[in-house]
Amino acid sequence: MQQLSKRRLSALFVTAFLPVTAFASECSSVRFAEVGWTDITVTTALASEVLEALGYEPRVDTVSVPIAYAGIRNNDFDVFLGNWMPSMASISDPYIERGEVERLVANLEGAKYTLAVPQYVYDAGVTSVNDLAEHADQFEQRIHGIEAGNDGNEL
């Protein structure tokens, strides 16, 4: 009687975990959307190393922010680690509100956009935003933003 119970228990144990192992075999790769920014490249590389050590096969594709979100919605990507909040709200919130993308946790809080100039421009007198108007001709009255489609260009 004791042996029969062990067999049944073993069968129950194996049966209970079959769906889990089937699911795990379907999830052997993790597809990252990455936007080519130094910080996100490093964050994605670190996450990829950890996942490789756990037996997963990470794949990283460099795309723009809008394509990253559309790719998650379309199941082309699993993860995007470059969501800057609140500055990316205009891109991410519609996907989140429709339940197409889930924001799990923040890996960077309080992110903001700001202007930067090369040292030679700073040395020429552009040390704050207020100096831009005075030197506007040197910049053809233009400020260049980040990649196309990024909401930071709207600021």
Curated annotation (Swiss-Prot):
Keywords of this entry: Signal
InterPro entries: ABC_Gly_betaine_transp_sub-bd
Record bears the keyword Signal: yes
Pfam family, one: OpuAC
Signal recorded as keyword: yes
Gene Ontology MF terms: transmembrane transporter activity
Gene3D superfamilies xrefs: Dipeptide-binding Protein, Domain 3, Glycine betaine-binding periplasmic protein, domain 2
Domain of life the protein comes from: Bacteria
A GO cellular component annotation in the UniProt record: ATP-binding cassette (ABC) transporter complex
Signal peptide: 1-24
Name by which UniProt lists this protein: Uncharacterized protein ORF1
